[in-house]
Design a protein with these regions (language model features):
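Glycine-rich cofactor phosphate-binding loops and adjacent beta1-alpha1 units
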Residues: 176-179, 209, 219-306, 372, ...
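C-terminal hydrophobic helical "lid"/dimerization subdomain
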Residues: 9, 315-387
């Protein structure tokens, strides 16, 4: 099948690789290519494969974390002698073959990753993401790091679901809001993870207040029925009327929003964050020089208000199961911005990582998908894409 990869500069004329264009990222030029990758050999009876599954990826998506990982891996390609580099961590795949000890899946099943963390899903396995190389098209993954895609979910929806939904469910569970109730606020609310958080909170009956750095369009508001929205521009403070108004704050980027969150939270409130915006020095988009001062002010406010500050990485298998169950009940989510074909790889990468107007996940189709799949690509100019 056709695989999408970033190609090493000295391999651009290599036979068998079709160069699709390039993307400039952090002063580095990433060349994107397509190549035929044959089905790997897989003997399910060998000890190395008994607990594993061979997958053919039907669609995949990138997460925010993948941008820094791709850059790190690219900068090491020459040292490691790599000709090309796949990328992407969310996927919907078809089971092609299973190991002799695998009883949970069979050929033809559709699966997505289970990114359970911090507890490993089986002895000897590392917790966390199932792959960082979904664009390769063929994956060999331990069965314990997979879960079945429900029949109600399209391939495109499944490819955009697991990591964000599992993280959001983990953050909500660990915040304690389901037990205590409360008035939640979501920072950077148009980010992919925040959209999952908002949808899940709405599903539980909450009316989250969603803050983003620019105005909301009517189309975007329709994706979050029952939520209230507002604007919190970078470098500004929340409106005085919102100070000490909320019981729980959910934030994907603590390096942007921690101080604002401490102002928004009431005494005894809870702040939960799952990461930071600037994850790679070459891709750090103007982190304020005064960020250390802002952090000090934020922690001082947390002390005065007796706030609980929690970090959260991914979620447990039960969190993903909870999110999948909610989807099957409501058919709500995930928010998908655009769907791309392999020849649109440059536009896909730009939209996934560098388009401030993106709303939801971008999905790349690698193989045939369900007739009911979401296919609503936006037509837009991507000025930073160069072919």
């Amino acid at each position: 099948m056709k695989s999408l990869v970033v190609v090493a500069p000295d391999q651009l004329h290599r036979k068998g690789i079709d160069i699709l264009g390039h993307v400039d990222a952090g002063g580095t030029r990433l060349h994107l290519g397509q190549l035929d990758f044959p089905q790997p050999d897989f003997d399910g009876k060998t000890p190395a494969n008994r607990e594993h599954v061979l997958l053919r990826v039907r669609a995949f998506a990138c997460n925010f974390r993948d941008k820094g990982i791709l850059m790190d891996n690219y900068l090491q390609m020459d040292r490691l002698g790599k000709a090309y580099l796949p990328f992407g961590s969310d996927f919907c795949a078809e089971v092609v073959a299973v190991g002799s000890n695998v009883t949970t899946f069979r050929a033809g099943d559709r699966v997505m990753g289970d990114f359970a963390y911090p507890n490993a899903p089986a002895p000897g396995l590392l917790p966390g993401v199932a792959t960082n190389f979904a664009s390769l098209g063929w994956l060999r993954i331990h069965a314990a790091k997979l879960t079945t895609v429900p029949p109600e979910m399209s391939d495109h929806q499944a490819a955009a679901f697991a990591l964000g939904a599992q993280t959001a469910a983990g953050m909500i569970r660990r915040s304690g809001i389901l037990e205590s109730g409360g008035n939640p606020v979501i920072l950077s609310a148009r980010s992919a993870t925040s959209l999952f958080i908002a949808q899940q909170l709405i599903g539980y009956g909450f009316r989250p207040h969603c803050l983003s750095s620019s105005e909301w369009s009517s189309e975007q508001l329709q994706a979050l029925p029952g939520a209230t929205t507002g604007v919190l521009r970078p470098g500004t403070f929340p409106a005085q009327a919102d100070h000490s108004k909320f019981t729980h704050a959910f934030d994907p980027f603590f390096d942007m929003n921690l101080e604002a969150a401490t102002l928004l939270l009431a005494n005894g409130g809870t702040y939960v964050t799952c990461g930071l915006r600037d994850q790679h020095p070459l891709l750090s988009d103007g982190t304020p020089e005064e960020s250390g001062v802002a952090l000090r002010r934020a922690l001082a406010m947390a002390v005065v208000k007796n706030l609980s500050v929690k970090g959260n990485c991914l979620g447990e298998s039960s969190d993903l199961a909870e999110a999948l169950g909610a989807f099957c009940d409501t058919r709500v989510g995930p928010v998908i911005d655009s769907v791309f074909e392999p020849q649109e790889a440059v536009a896909f990468l730009v939209s996934s990582f560098f388009d401030p107007g993106r709303f939801g996940k971008c999905v790349m189709t690698l193989a045939s998908v369900n007739p009911g799949a979401v296919t609503t690509p936006r037509t837009k100019a991507l000025a930073t894409a160069t072919v």
